[in-house]
UniProtKB/Swiss-Prot annotation:
Top-level division of the source organism's lineage: Archaea
Keywords (A to Z) from UniProt: ATP-binding, Chaperone, Cytoplasm, Hydrolase, Nucleotide-binding
Its biological purpose: Molecular chaperone; binds unfolded polypeptides in vitro, and has a weak ATPase activity.
First-listed, main subcellular location of the protein, grouped into a coarse class: cytoplasm
UniProt-recorded name of the protein: Thermosome subunit gamma
GO function terms (MF aspect): ATP binding; ATP hydrolysis activity; ATP-dependent protein folding chaperone; unfolded protein binding
Location relative to the cell: Cytoplasm
Any Pfam family hit: Cpn60_TCP1
Amino acid sequence: MAYLLREGTQRSTGNEVILNNIAVAKILLEMLKSSLGPKGLDKMLVEGQDITITNDGATIVKNMEVQHPTAKLLIETAKTVDTEVGDGTTSVVVLAGLLLEKAEDLLNQKIHPTVIIEGYRKALSSSLELLKSIADKISPEDRKIVHDLVYTTLSSKFFSTEHTLEKIINLVIEASLAVLDKRDGTYDLDIKNIKIVKVNGGEFDDSELVNGIVVDKEPTNENMPKRAENVKVMLADFPLKLEKTEISMKLGISDPTQIKGYLDEQTAYVKQMVDKIKAMGVKLFITQKDIDEVASYLMGKSGIIALKNVKRSDIELLSRATGAKIASSMKDANESDLGEAKLVEVRNLGKNKYLFIQSDKAKAVTVIIKGSNNMVTDEAERSLNDAFNSIRNLLLEPYIVAGGGAVEEELAKRLRENAGKVPGKEQLAFNAFADALEEYVSILSETAGMDPISALTEIRHKHANGLKNAGIDIVKARIYDNMLELKVIDSLKVKEQVLKSATEAATAILKIDDMIAAAPAKQQPQPQQPNPYLG
């Protein structure tokens, strides 16, 4: 081994490696479990002068700069869950940590890691089957169900009053309906078609939905109209100016009048482009590139509103909002590529001016969120993204389960009932999986300020008596018989993803029995430079 590995390389093997990795997972579990659920506590994330206060799992894990490879694996798992379903990031790290904590007890009983892994995999397979039987199929067109799902998602956020929460819920639902694509009985919600604009100043109650796109730009010339109705829209990916050639050239000027002639030619070139835009009936011209002063002046004189240097993402949203195609050159532009806007208007939002481009048929919309400061509006944006994702998940898989730990407790109960069918020592791991799910419920009750032992005893009793939807009423810190009545519901898709990802992460860590930490490469000594001040 001394000749195989570089000098200074460290190696550890066997259960020592597994137990060390489990210890790292338990540290992450301790860090995140207090943020679980609607009453979860916030974390303050500090990076230089930037401060973020949040209980959003995705934000917490994205800002954690961990060094240990096991911690990195768990963080990447959480990020994957966030990408797939947009929710459940805290849950997946907590559940993976609990599975590894239970595995540690089995390892101490001399149960082999392979046996534990196989038991966990069988428990996962059984859990996914049981989830389908526990879940209720719903119609995506049932607005009450959609409302309750968004309510559950946003109830863990910091919206101060029930009135504000209801306003934000309705805003989320209306925005989703505006961009919803229904084909052959299936639904598709592309969240990229919903733009969120954050404005400092005002209250959440002042937030609004705009059927169209709001761009943080002003018209390029002060003489341009500040408002126009029923306008034709042109979107461009080319500049309105005389472009520089790739080849450097010099002009020889022998007469001052030649300068004027050269400038007149430039103006004529730009005027030709503006005249074509005007001839097509365009009243709003937006480009991703630059517009020079001459073009701005000429368009202002012609009553055309123009924006320059607009972000590509906004151009694409405007295309979906107005129906305009993006022209790549003036030569290719034609009237059939134009879109329409019912209203174009410059408005003040906070301390800045924005251009509102609205259309009744817009397939892209803007949600304007107002709050007292950046931290508040940033957290509100994260909350809205979670809510939009919850609706998307429901449309992809129209099944719901009761929240508040109800589905985890019911799964734990049914897994224990089926454990007798699992042969050998794998049965111990199968039961440990159920214990981890129940421990998850215990943590949820603790974040609600309840005594976890009393809460777990009561919820077990209710599920044993057939109340499959009994869970933790976080608001009143009690166990309630039917969480669906309290509008506390979760998407089946999120629960499935959390179970799969947590189990995969836990089993991946349990499979590692050898860790080799390579020594850092020795740096070659730099040759000394002669001192010019010495002889």
